[in-house]
């Protein structure tokens, strides 16, 4: 590898599987150090060990909706690896229901994980990384569902659209204040992850492929490499931008 992330220290939420695990793997391969998070310790410890030793990657048990836990996460990461330079707010969930059939509990749960959790990470990231000349980068995982309306993903659409616009606000604020913190969003299309695997039935999987102009769904590494770019100094002039990786889905 080309050591594009030498000297970078990243927090990757939801980093124990799927896109988050791929991001962590590529970050370490490019010279970065990573703290991955998740709710299940056994899964998290195994995931970290699959990538490297504790000198380059560790696991911290954390629910992205736990506001106080974010402070503990930052402290643990900086104790292990030094000043945090990068946050990848990747933890997310979806309930496959229309607005009409979504319960209040399901609505609040998806907004809590997908939007509140990203807000906590973005806010604390700005507070802790600003004015330190770290080339700091906050990468917020949205979705193509932040652009389009899906009849069976009402709450998910709302949460991912919220991530998209909130990130723009944060990016402009940081730029105007010369904080040296960039904020961007990544918008995956259909990617081979547990979230997509949970789509109901073989017909849904076939639909995901046929709706994508390239004729197939993406791989987690397709998203991970975009995140490497955004975490690196190569993207020093990119902020408030939307990086769509969807095989042409939203170009239709």
Per-range role (PLM):
Residues 9, 16-17, 40:
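Conserved glycine-rich cofactor-binding loop
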Residues 2, 148, 214, 227-228, ...:
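Short C-terminal tail/terminal secondary-structure segment
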Residues 127, 172-176, 236:
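Alpha-helical segment proximal to the catalytic Tyr-Lys
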Residues 143:
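Residue(s) in the substrate-gating loop at a strand-loop-helix junction
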Residues 122, 159, 167:
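Active-site helix of classical SDR
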Residues 180-182, 238-240:
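Short, small/polar-rich loop/turn modules that mediate ligand/substrate recognition or access, typified
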Residues 98-99, 103-111, 196, 208:
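Substrate-binding pocket helix/loop in short-chain dehydrogenase/reductase
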């Amino acid at each position: 590898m080309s050591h594009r992330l030498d000297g970078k220290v990243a927090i990757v939420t939801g980093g124990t599987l799927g896109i988050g695990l791929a991001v962590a793997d590529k970050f370490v391969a490019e010279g970065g150090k990573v703290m991955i998070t998740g709710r299940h310790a056994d899964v998290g410890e195994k995931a970290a060990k699959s990538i490297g030793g504790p000198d380059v990657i560790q696991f911290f048990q954390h629910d992205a909706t736990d506001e106080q836990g974010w402070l503990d996460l930052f402290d643990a990461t900086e104790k292990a690896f030094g000043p945090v330079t990068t946050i990848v707010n990747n933890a997310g969930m979806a309930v496959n229901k229309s607005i009409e059939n979504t319960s209040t509990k399901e609505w609040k749960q998806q907004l809590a994980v997908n939007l509140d959790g990203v807000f906590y990470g973005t806010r604390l990231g700005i507070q802790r990384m600003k004015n330190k000349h770290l080339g700091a980068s906050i990468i917020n995982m949205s979705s193509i569902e932040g652009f389009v309306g899906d009849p069976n993903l009402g709450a998910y659409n709302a949460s991912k659209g919220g991530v998209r616009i909130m990130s723009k606000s944060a990016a402009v604020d940081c730029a105007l204040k010369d904080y040296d913190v960039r904020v961007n969003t990544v918008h995956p299309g259909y990617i081979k992850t547990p979230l997509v695997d949970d789509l109901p039935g073989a017909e849904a999987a076939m639909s995901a492929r046929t709706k994508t102009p390239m004729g197939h769904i993406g791989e987690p590494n397709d998203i991970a490499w975009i995140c490497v770019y955004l975490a690196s100094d190569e993207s020093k002039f990119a902020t408030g931008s939307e990086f769509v990786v969807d095989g042409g889905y939203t170009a239709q």
